[in-house]
């Protein structure tokens, strides 16, 4: 259907579904954009869905495996989800910042050690999952994820798909954008703190306009998961990315005004991309030219402009107002800043940044080599490795394919159409990711577009709707939509890796550090975790040790006193993959997973006298129902 043709619904009611969504978005932003996007599209406005034969490329037959792993942020569910691509089948959920009843994450002693002091928070808001790299390629060792809600960053071991470290970032609020050092390997995890706060933030002032109100750019040591350094910036920080040399990182800023309301944050016609020179930051720290803030010992370097002069470690590149996504092209040539309130994307030539820092360029805008007009509400850009970029247009509800080289030519004044195609998506897309797109191996096979609204695409589920993650075939010249995938609240982003890049364990290693502290506790008690079924009392603290082998626990009953603090430690002796056991103490809020060769423990108070049954919560055997026992609690 062309734009000029009205549907019967439009004739009757004035607006169709797409028109309503577009009008709603434009109400809040069109006046701020100030210009319509130009450029032609190869296909029309209506979604180009793949035919049946083409859709079969995304079908994975029963018993067959997907070509890619996909790791989805779980948004404010606080978890990470693992999907197979292209089937879009959910394979696993990895609890991170949330409490998970199925596995006992947030309840077990092992998970509480990982959560540390932040275990007091029962929520999280995951946005940006990223896989560790070596030489610009995924090495499959770790996945890192941010928590915007409680200013944390977590690391997930991909061999066992479990979170093993969490760090709370000091001196900041709301960790949002997160990216990794790509070469020579992931030594740093870079993350943006979004909101400006006063320093010290102790209630002595609420003024955010002065020099003592700011936010910081943060670098985390990927191995120790300790904050290595921080950089004070002008304005705020949104999204970030790293180059392929290890020297430059860049972040978008949408609040250069340091405003506290919507109108104020959109006042300036230009905001900026701030570029960080990583070796220069390290040199400043080595030379002791840093401060610390509050009780934190993290080195803090000042990256703000002073008296019109740049700092040694940062440069600020003006771009159209309120930019959002920041993406590095897989050839290492460009940082792409997505306009959001401008219909443009700004292409920053990474090779010119050295001259910018050296003072050889008169204007920081001299590093800009392209600024294509793409459509309304460009948010994020991904790449196919063949010289094309794909940008989500939130207001237009489209994915636009455009050519990087042609956009550069157009910026120089040539009459060239850089737009290859526009594809309707459903509806209001945010992040998008192509297969291997954040590495030098981008292969241009699939794109996942994470659309924020599903509206009428699925069976109704009441007032709360799922989001819609759409799979698009980009292997040919034309983009083709092949799959709609409903997702629960609220994935922001995903990352896609080849299945051969992720090496998982089938059963636990008995020497695994995940439960090493629990093993040490048992050794101190003289317990052999592979055979002993014993109860150790130390005052009112009782430690219950048992083994399990489907379909039985090593102890079918144990006795404690009312008010005792009870720690149950179980070791699963099964050596066959997928024979996971569980432990639930009825009416005590106690549940945990014990996978093959794993040791798990959980602590609770036996506050009710009487007989209390426990059972295996995972169906591990035909006699699963009989796998149970009793805690006998003597009245105090």
UniProtKB/Swiss-Prot annotation:
GO terms for molecular function: calcium ion binding; copper ion binding; cytochrome-c oxidase activity; nitrous-oxide reductase activity. Residues 302-322 are annotated as: Disordered. It comes from Pseudomonas aeruginosa (strain ATCC 15692 / DSM 22644 / CIP 104116 / JCM 14847 / LMG 12228 / 1C / PRS 101 / PAO1). Binds 2 calcium ions per subunit. Pfam families: COX2, nos_propeller, nos_propeller_2. Cu cation Z2 binds at residues 127, 176. Ca(2+) 1 binds at residues 452, 467. CDD domains: N2OR_C (cd04223). It is found in: Periplasm. It comes from the Bacteria. This is Nitrous-oxide reductase. Cu cation A2 binds at residues 616, 618, 620, 624. Gene3D superfamilies: Cupredoxins - blue copper proteins, YVTN repeat-like/Quinoprotein amine dehydrogenase. PROSITE patterns: COX2, COX2_CUA, TAT. Nitrous-oxide reductase is part of a bacterial respiratory system which is activated under anaerobic conditions in the presence of nitrate or nitrous oxide. The keyword Cell division does not apply. Its EC number is 1.7.2.4. Homodimer. Pathway: Nitrogen metabolism; nitrate reduction (denitrification); dinitrogen from nitrate: step 4/4. Belongs to the NosZ family. In the C-terminal section; belongs to the cytochrome c oxidase subunit 2 family. InterPro entries: CcO_II-like_C, Copper_CuA, Cupredoxin, N2O_reductase_N, N2OR_C, NO_Rdtase, Nos_propeller, NOS_propeller_2.
């Amino acid at each position: 259907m062309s734009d000029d043709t009205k549907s019967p619904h439009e004739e009757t009611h004035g607006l169709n579904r797409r028109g309503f969504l577009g009008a709603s978005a434009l109400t809040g932003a069109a006046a701020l954009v100030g210009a319509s996007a130009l450029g032609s599209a190869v296909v029309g406005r209506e979604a180009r869905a793949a035919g049946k034969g083409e859709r079969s490329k995304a079908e994975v037959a029963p018993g067959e495996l997907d070509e890619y792993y996909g790791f989805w942020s779980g948004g404010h569910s606080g978890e990470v989800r693992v999907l197979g691509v292209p089937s879009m089948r959910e394979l696993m959920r990895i609890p991170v910042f949330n409490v998970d009843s199925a596995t006992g994450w947030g309840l077990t002693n092992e998970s509480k050690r990982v959560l540390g002091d932040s275990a007091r928070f029962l929520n999280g808001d995951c946005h940006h999952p990223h896989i560790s790299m070596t030489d610009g390629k995924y090495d499959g060792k770790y996945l890192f994820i941010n928590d915007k809600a409680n200013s944390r960053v977590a690391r997930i071991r991909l061999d066992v798909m479990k979170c093993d470290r969490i760090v709370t970032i000091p001196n900041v609020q709301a960790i949002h954008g997160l990216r990794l050092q790509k070469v020579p390997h992931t030594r740093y995890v870079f993350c943006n703190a979004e909101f400006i706060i006063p320093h010290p933030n102790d209630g002595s002032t609420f003024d955010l306009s002065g020099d003592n109100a700011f936010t910081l750019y943060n670098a985390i040591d990927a191995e120790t998961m300790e904050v290595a350094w921080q950089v004070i910036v002008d304005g705020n920080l949104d999204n970030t990315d790293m180059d392929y040399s290890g020297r430059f990182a860049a972040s978008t800023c949408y609040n250069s005004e340091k405003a506290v309301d919507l109108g104020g944050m959109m006042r300036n016609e230009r905001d900026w991309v701030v570029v960080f020179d990583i070796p220069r930051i390290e040199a400043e720290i080595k030379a002791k030219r840093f401060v610390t803030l509050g009780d934190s010992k993290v080195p803090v370097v000042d990256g703000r402009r002073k008296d019109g002069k740049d700092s040694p470690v940062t440069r600020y590149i003006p771009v159209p107002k309120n930019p959002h996504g920041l993406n590095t092209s897989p050839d290492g040539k460009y940082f792409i800043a997505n306009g959001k309130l401008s219909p443009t994307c700004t292409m920053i030539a990474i090779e010119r940044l050295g001259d910018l820092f050296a003072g050889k360029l008169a204007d920081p805008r001299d590093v800009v080599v392209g600024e294509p007009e793409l459509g309304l509400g460009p948010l994020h850009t991904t790449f196919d490795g063949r010289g094309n970029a794909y940008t989500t247009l939130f207001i237009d509800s489209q994915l636009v394919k455009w050519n990087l080289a042609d956009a550069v030519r157009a910026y120089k004044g040539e009459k060239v159409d850089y737009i290859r195609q526009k594809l309707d998506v459903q509806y209001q897309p945010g992040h998008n990711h192509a297969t291997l797109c954040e590495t030098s191996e981008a292969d241009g096979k699939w794109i996942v577009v994470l659309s924020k609204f599903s509206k009428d695409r699925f069976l109704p589920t009441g007032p709360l709707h799922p989001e819609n993650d759409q799979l698009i075939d980009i292997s040919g010249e034309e983009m083709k939509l092949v799959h709609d995938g409903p997702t629960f609240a609220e994935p922001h982003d995903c990352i896609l890796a080849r299945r051969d890049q992720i090496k998982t364990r089938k059963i636990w290693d008995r020497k695994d550090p995940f439960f090493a502290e629990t093993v040490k506790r048992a050794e101190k008690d003289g317990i052999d975790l592979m055979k002993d079924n014993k109860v150790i009392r130390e005052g009112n603290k009782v430690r219950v040790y048992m083994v399990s082998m489907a379909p039985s626990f090593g102890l079918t009953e144990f006795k404690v006193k009312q008010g005792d603090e009870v720690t149950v430690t179980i070791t699963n002796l099964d050596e066959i993959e997928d024979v996971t056991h569980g432990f639930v103490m009825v009416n005590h809020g106690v549940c945990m997973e014990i996978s093959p060769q794993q040791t798990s423990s959980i602590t609770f108070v036996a506050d009710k006298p009487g007989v209390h049954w426990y059972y295996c919560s995972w169906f591990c055997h035909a006699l699963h129902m009989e796998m149970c026992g009793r805690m006998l609690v003597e009245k105090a």
